[in-house]
Structure formats: C-alpha cells, structure tokens
C-alpha cells in the first residue's frame, strides 16, 4: 500500500482509466455480469463432481454483525427484527379456527445490507452519477428506477473461483489494515492452480469473519478496520474481466482506507458506478475453506 493518500485527482484519473460506461450499450444496468455468457454457465455446470451444497450466508437473525461496536460512526444498519404473526400457541388455543386453517406466519424487518449480500449498481455513486452514467436522482424514495439489484435476478450464475488469500499468506486471518495486492490475488490463484477466466465470480477469504466468530464478538467488524482489497486491485478487476467479486469482510476494501479525509471507500467509488461491478460482502467462508 502506498504511503501517499489517494486524493480527488487520483479518483478522477481512476474513473477515466477504469470507466466501462457504454461498453454494453447505453441502456445497460448489470455491468460486468455481461462478461458471463450462456456458454460459460453451461461449462460451469459441468464442473460439479460431488453435488455438495455449501451456504456462504450468515443467518438473517439477531446474532448478525450489524450494530456491533465500531470506532467509526454508525451507518444506521441493524440486525433483522423477527416478529411472529401467527404461532402454534394461537393454533392450539383455537383462535385461528375461524380462518379454517391452523398455521404459523411471521415477518422480518431489516436493512437489506444487514448480513450476507450483494451491493447493487444503484448503491454507490461517483459524484452525481451511478453505473453507466445514469443520474443518481434515478434512486428515489420509491426505490431505484435504474440499476436496482432486481435487474440481476436472472444473471448471477457462473463459475465460482475461491481464492484463500489468508492461507496463501500462511495466517489464520489477515491483519486489520492489510491491503490485498494484485500480487496476492494472482499468487493465490497460481498456488491453488486456478486459471482465472473472463466472467468468473471470484470469492476471496481474508479470515476476518472467522476471527470474529472465534472471539464470540462482532465488535469492530461492521465499518471498522479490516483487511481488504487495496486500491491497486482495480487493475485485477479490469484485467481479469470477472463478473463479480466477494469477500468475508464488511466492506471488501481495506480499512482504514488508503484515501485522504472526505473520500470514504474509494475502491467502491470506482468498482460499482464506474466499472459496473457488483460486490458481495459479509460472506461466510469457513466451511468452503475447510
């Protein structure tokens, strides 16, 4: 990581260097997901050998990471609030019989970034623009009129590539503030004997989530200091032409950020609105790593 802080001019230069606006036409709303072709999806299905299913998600419940202590200001996100609308007790008492059916029902109230999730292309803006040059005012109190995450519902399928950077560096977890470099990513792929291909979904393990789980506390995880992608890995994203990138940290990129005051999450500024790449955050990778 460079000792010099990334400034506004660096951000302008990066926006110009990595811009994909118009690459898939003026009306595109899914960005780098376009790198994955139907042929790629068919090829990916042929890689299945055991049929074992591994979830990479945390449970959506009160034990999640949001709301834990952090040295940075809160983003206002909370863990899911679960409310029962009908229960087995209601059924047993007979109060449901007037409806002619005994059943349980419930509801969940939560921020959409409360746990394991994908950042949509309407999430982060570069100045007053989102992906493909759409005006940020397309996101209103009624929701995202452009680049909503729902646009990806029939697109997010492809070959997954797991890069265990923590294991490559011979540690249980990368240190907070460690910026993962291009060399780390390519070195991990080489050690694992993986050839990265256009349209891949790359999942990177830092070990941070497991560190928190082992300690029995999420304090410092949501919005705190963390290992993550250094700003230089924008080259990796560009050169590999990957479809999407995910990690086991709260915000993917290294924290504290490499930028000067007033530029929060600079890697996000470029990957989402400029390059059109959705990213996955808070992925639970322990079972996959084992």
Residue ranges and their predicted role:
Residues 1-290:
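Active-/binding-site microenvironments in catalytic and ligand-binding cores
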